[in-house]
Amino acid sequence: SGMVVSPGFIDMHTHLEPIMEMPDAKSLIMQGVTLALGGPDGGGPWPFGSYLDSLEQLGTGPNLAYLIGHNTIRREVMGNVDQAPTLSQMDSMKNYVEMAMKEGAFGISTGLKYLPGTFAKVDEIISLSKVASSYQGIYTSHLREEGLGLIDAVQEAILISKEAEIPVVLTHHKAIGVKMWGASVKTLSLVDSARKEGL
């Protein structure tokens, strides 16, 4: 009496870095989370497949899924340099995304506010997201900007979704600073319009 029964919750943005030390993940289970999606904000494990193998051998409390992190693979290929990738570097990153998708990644994440993702132009993200899309993956993004550039950042994420034909999840969708008060009316309108287009 007075209780509610519901399906388990899916946590779409989980920093699972301590999972090897706390595999039971009691804090998630106690909140009703039965599936946690790791690798947000462009971060995540590398090498991807061997990390998942280690988790499987360890055993975890909740079900876990992971995204391949753009920052992780960009750093692996290019370091933290502020430049566009060469064709060879782009091919390497695409190969890493494809390999991770084949190894079980649920999609790709970006942290365009963080190094080295902040150096990536939209075309780079679209190209990599197309690879994830070809395996029915999703795209999640810590937006490039949450303050004065918020509207442009939301438009960028929607453009990536449209061009790569991939579902997008906006993480940390917030308007920072007094000058941005009320901007969420505009950004939520952009999201609603994108959803109506099937994105």
Could you describe each region identified by the protein language model?
Residues 3-4, 14, 22-110, 129:
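Divalent-metal coordination cores built from histidine and acidic residues
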Residues 6-7, 138:
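Short, proline-centered helix/strand-breaking motifs
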Residues 7-17:
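Metallo-beta-lactamase
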Residues 8, 60-62, 166:
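A generic secondary-structure signal marking the coil-to-beta-strand transition
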Residues 20, 24, 43-47, 124, ...:
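Short acidic-hydrophobic sequence patches enriched in Asp/Glu that either
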Residues 85-110, 116-199:
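Histidine/acidic residue-rich metal-binding segments in metalloenzymes
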